[in-house]
Swiss-Prot record:
Gene3D superfamilies: Aminomethyltransferase beta-barrel domains (3.30.70.1400), Aminomethyltransferase fragment (4.10.1250.10), Probable tRNA modification gtpase trme, domain 1 (3.30.1360.120). Pfam families: GCV_T, GCV_T_C. One of its GO terms (molecular function) is transaminase activity. It catalyses: N(6)-[(R)-S(8)-aminomethyldihydrolipoyl]-L-lysyl-[protein] + (6S)-5,6,7,8-tetrahydrofolate = N(6)-[(R)-dihydrolipoyl]-L-lysyl-[protein] + (6R)-5,10-methylene-5,6,7,8-tetrahydrofolate + NH4(+). Belongs to the GcvT family. This is Aminomethyltransferase. InterPro entries: GCS_T (IPR006223), GCS_T_bac (IPR022903), GCST_C (IPR013977), GCV_T_N (IPR006222), GcvT/YgfZ/DmdA (IPR028896), GcvT/YgfZ_C (IPR029043), TrmE/GcvT_dom1 (IPR027266). Disulfide bonds: none annotated. Keywords: Aminotransferase, Transferase. It comes from Photorhabdus laumondii subsp. laumondii (strain DSM 15139 / CIP 105565 / TT01) (Photorhabdus luminescens subsp. laumondii).
Amino acid sequence: MAKQTPLYDQHLACGARMVDFHGWMMPLHYGSQMDEHHIVRTHAGMFDVSHMTIVDLHGTGCRDFLRYLLANDIAKLTEKGKALYTGMLNASGGVIDDLIVYYLSNDFYRLVVNSATREKDLAWINEHVANYPVDIQVRDDLALIAVQGPDAQAKVESLLNDEQKQTIAGMKPFFGVQAGDLFIATTGYTGEAGYEVALPKEQAADFWQKLLSVGVKPAGLGARDTLRLEAGMNLYGQEMDETISPLVANMGWTIAWKPEDRQFIGREALEKQREEGTEQLVGLVMREKGVLRGGLAVSFTDEMGTLHSGVITSGTFSPTLGFSIALARVPQGIGEQAVVQIRNREMPVQVVKPSFVRAGKPLV
């Protein structure tokens, strides 16, 4: 039986088409995925992301533990509330999960991990925490609502009391702070400004209704996927998994190589990969008719005339751009043009950096 978030009844009341998403009943759309996409790019939309797992770490060993567990270095986090995006890797350098970690105090960190990887994430964390004085608390008592778009922050702020407004005033991107009952973070998965709000699950339905009352529109998994793909953001299980390293998945920037004496899980494997070279993640644009889809083959000829092949990891029609875009894993040496096999046709595609739209503005 698929699980329900605290907002299940609200989704039904909003006319959602519900689907089973990794064991959770979640809204795919509320009538028009395209409209929901555009609302987030131009005004404000909200997503129920309560299926994601919030894990709080308390104790004097948190800092040392997370510096060993994660590829990025939480020692960079010196300002209270600052967040970091990172991979949690296995010994061979594969990505067990990508996650966000918030520094809330020297002995309090908060992780937000993916829903599909919940059980293996918790098992991995518990397996490696044994030697550290750390208490792990899974926050199943919290719901999580992402409000995204150019008007999103103003809409959320209109619902806050004066003390909460003061708490979040001037908060920079990629920070999180506790404001009364709400944990408010300037993070997201759309390429737009916004807030992700964690709150006691018994308050979630009321907060959702208040957001509706100030004109925030609900958006489902369909729009969430096209928005994140336009923004060039990875989806676990497509751009990376336990067999794919961050170096291959355009996550090299999330690996903290220095200090060189910091030992983290997967470091040795990554150093070898960095030396030997890896495949890379690129963006593809197809202005011809048709849609690029995950799993399609990509081919190109390098400067030496050698034919190489790769694969599309995620692809879609871009509602913002009006043509098809994709992320693809390919060998090094690709130029500005490639070919994608769609049914029996070879379609020309342009190779670009793996990011297409940010803050509503086209990058291609």
